[in-house]
Amino acid sequence: MSEIRLFVTTTEKQAAAVLDVMSAIFEEDDYAIATMEIDEKRDVWEASVYMMTDEEESVRSRLAQALEVEFSHLPIEREVLPDVDWIAKSLEGLAPVRAGRFVIHGSHDRDKVKPGEIAIEIDAGQAFGTGHHGTTAGCLEMLASVARSRPVRNALDLGTGSGVLAIAAWKLLHVPVLATDIDPIATRVAADNARRNGVVTGLTFATAPGFHSTTFSTNGPFDLIIANILARPLMKMAPQLVANLAPGGSVILSGILAEQRWKVLAAYNGQNLKHARTLWRNGWVTIHLTR
């Protein structure tokens, strides 16, 4: 069975708006969504959703219905994707990523780690998060900044993916870290990556949808919560996330497009958190808030 990409071609601004629509209608599904720049000079972008061939008819119908009010002029195009390990392929030849004191590298680049750097080795796998995306790098840089300015006794990495942020938090802070994900594959991959990086104690991994698990009350409240997911779920879970934050604690949020920043800030200001800092990387933002 092949993988299909359904997409619309438009401007950067409209692609971001279409991505918001996709996030809303596919929030409870496991479909990957993304925007991609096609032509910088002509401001041509694509907003895409990925699925298997047997799901195409249903996804197309839902997408067309959601787009017909504001974006009916944008045709939904289709591409059949070849059977390629895109994660592995995309990492071929990628240089190590440096963010603050952290360097994220593949096993083929161990010799490029410099003295004094905090090295985290992440190879291509089934879970998201290699450090090459602006949101992951932004979280790493913000983590280093928070560690310099505020005491942290424990931390939560919500939506851990490959585990890179949880591993980074433990290596930098040396405090108990809980790492959760809704995907059991991600949880397993993250635990494997932690062991590969020599982190065998101090990190707890759990498969948990949102905050509907006793693992949060058992391990929390948390001095630091890192959530690198998407803007819409971040806004939706703001009350539950803040309920698990310790007094005086910090929150690092990412997976947020620059134009979505104000909506996310409004959701967390409504929970009495204060904006401390925003980092900008390649159209994405990472936000630090405090209690």
From Swiss-Prot:
Enzymatic reactions: L-lysyl-[protein] + 3 S-adenosyl-L-methionine = N(6),N(6),N(6)-trimethyl-L-lysyl-[protein] + 3 S-adenosyl-L-homocysteine + 3 H(+)
Molecular function terms, GO-annotated: protein-lysine N-methyltransferase activity
Keywords per UniProt: Cytoplasm, Methyltransferase, S-adenosyl-L-methionine, Transferase
A Pfam family of this chain: PrmA
Gene Ontology CC: cytoplasm
One GO term (biological process): methylation
InterPro entries noted in UniProt: Ribosomal_L11_MeTrfase_PrmA, Ribosomal_PrmA_MeTrfase, SAM-dependent_MTases_sf
Domain of life: Bacteria
EC number(s) recorded for this UniProt protein: 2.1.1.-
Keyword check for Methyltransferase: yes
Classification via CDD domains: AdoMet_MTases
Localization (cell): Cytoplasm
Residues at which S-adenosyl-L-methionine binds: 136, 159, 181, 228
Database matches in Gene3D superfamilies: Vaccinia Virus protein VP39 (3.40.50.150)
Function recorded in the entry: Methylates ribosomal protein L11.
Protein family per UniProt: Belongs to the methyltransferase superfamily. PrmA family.
Protein name: Ribosomal protein L11 methyltransferase
Source organism phylogeny: Bacteria, Pseudomonadati, Pseudomonadota, Alphaproteobacteria, Hyphomicrobiales
Encoding gene (name): prmA
